[in-house]
Structures are given as structure tokens and as C-alpha cells.
Amino acid sequence: MDMNIVCLDLEGVLVPEIWIAFAETSGIPELKRTTRDEPDYDKLMKWRLGILKEHGLGLKEIQETIAKIDPIPGAKEFLDELRSITQVIIISDTFSQFAGPLMKKLGYPTIFCNSLEVADNGEITGFKMRVENSKYTTVKALQSIGFQTIASGDSHNDLGMIQASKAGFLFKSTEQIKKDHPELPAYETYDELMAAIKSCLLYTSPSPRDLSTS
């Protein structure tokens, strides 16, 4: 039985960064700041919500941008193949109100994410994180119920789950993060990442004898 779960980040790994796309659509360059630049997600989100309020923008405007976002070329095929050989969970600090349309385009994989607090007029008034330090906490919880995790992401907030997993990889990350973490293998293409994940799965697959005695 496959006791592995592959845990992937969403933005920057499978789909373009939502906030960068919205910054370009709305003409507000400050919103291009992401977790690649700011490790403190709580601080980053409060700052983003302040900018949205200042410009009178809400959930509707962001969702209109998200509707036009397509997965990174090759992402859906990568995910389809990966899900055919092992279990996959997307662990993201994004929000369910943002992720829904993107999950449809990716074939409805399982995603663990957070939720926005939205007023009746569409203003985003706050956000609710599922748990603190959600990516790290989630992989540790999976490990506590008998799973081995393999993790990959591109940003500061992915490092916890990558380092806590039996195998972890940077994917499409920044030069600075790669330089700061030379111990982590870093890949740029889905083929490279797939090969790395497959080598981990192969290494931990039970032998036929193990299966016959289980």
C-alpha cells in the first residue's frame, strides 16, 4: 500500500501567482509582493487588505481576474500523472474563494487552504487561517497518522513543509531562496520534479513479498 502523500504548493508551482496577476489587471504594482518577498504571511495579507480597501476593491474584482488565469503550461498534465501513481494534496495559503475556479482547471485535486471574511458589499474584511503555520502543521499531522510526505514549493512559507518531509524540493523558486538553501534540490521543469518524486516513491515502494504478507 502506498503510504506516501505528495504535498504541493499551488501558486508559483501549478498556477501563476494570483496577486501578481491582480496587480497587473488593477494597475496597483504594490500588490506584486508575495511570500517570495515577505516571509510573514499574516503581515503580508493585512498589508494587501489595506491596499484593497484604499482602492475600493473587493472579492468580485479579484475573482474576475482569477477567472482568466490558466494553470502554468504542463501543470495539469503533471498533476494528472502524479495523481495516477500516488496520493497528492495541494497545501496552499490561498483562500477557498480564490482557489475554486483554479481547481476546476486542474481537475479538482484535493486542496487544503484558508478562507476570507467578506462583507455583504464584497469588501474583504479579514481572513481565517485554517491552522497556524499551516503547511508545516499539515505535513506533521499527515506523518502522525502514518504517512510519509514528499513536499515541493517555491516560497519562504513552503520551507517548513519541505524541510519536515522525508524528501523535499524547491520548484521554480527564486535565486535568493535557492542560494539560502543549497541543501534543497531545486528544479525548474515538471519533468525534473516528476523524476525526483518518482525516485522517492520507487525507493519506498514495498516489495511484492511485503505485499503478499500484509
Predicted regions and their residues:
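Short, well-ordered alpha-helical microsegments
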Residues: 96-100, 158-159, 194
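Alpha-helical substrate-recognition element adjacent to the catalytic core
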Residues: 4-115, 119-120
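Alpha-helical segments flanking ligand/cofactor-binding loops in enzyme cores
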Residues: 80, 140, 159-160
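Acidic, Mg2+-coordinating phosphoryl-transfer loop and its flanking beta/alpha structural elements
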Residues: 92-93, 148-186
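Single conserved hydrophobic/aromatic residue that forms the stacking wall/gate
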Residues: 203-214
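Short, acidic/turn-prone active-site loops that include or flank metal/cofactor-
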Residues: 115-118, 173-177, 191-193
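Substrate-recognition "cap/lid" segment bordering the active-site pocket of phosphatases
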Residues: 97-149, 180
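Structured helix-beta-strand junction loops
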Residues: 84-85, 145, 164, 180, ...
